[in-house]
Amino acid sequence: MVKILLVDDSKFLRLATERALARAGYEVCTAGMGKDALKLAQEKRPDLILLDMLLPGMTGPEVLKALKKDPATANIAVVVLTGLSPKNASRLRDDGAVAFLEKSALGLDKGCDTLLSALAEIVRQLKLEVPAAQAAGA
């Protein structure tokens, strides 16, 4: 089962996305702050991190750099989520992000369909096992 750490300061977005990911067959843990994300990444060793860019205390780019600097978390794939324009996408990729998704295009109003489709493709590219529920289109 693919383990995902979802990091976003919006409780609503975390809950809605966590439910959709769990229904699709992913194992999910969540964090609302950057420092909590770093701790959970070390403890849970997720396969993938969905990381918001605007976090309180420690920004998404700071979290990304800290993850990639730590040998224990450096190999975890990080997908950047943001409500901002993708101006900085190439810099974030240079810092270690494997993909960049705009929150406005995630389909939160439709059960996160767009996110789940994009995530299934990213999981395939990373050669992780797509959950059976996701592969079946649930």
Regions found by a protein language model. Give the residues of each.
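Short hydrophobic/Thr-rich beta-strand motif most characteristic of the beta2 strand and flanking loop
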Residues: 25-32, 40
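Charged docking surfaces used in two-component/phosphorelay signaling
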Residues: 15-19, 23
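Conserved acidic carboxylate
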Residues: 8
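The feature encodes the CheY-like receiver
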Residues: 56, 74
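Active-site beta3 strand of CheY-like receiver
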Residues: 44-50, 55
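CheY-like receiver
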Residues: 108, 112, 120-138
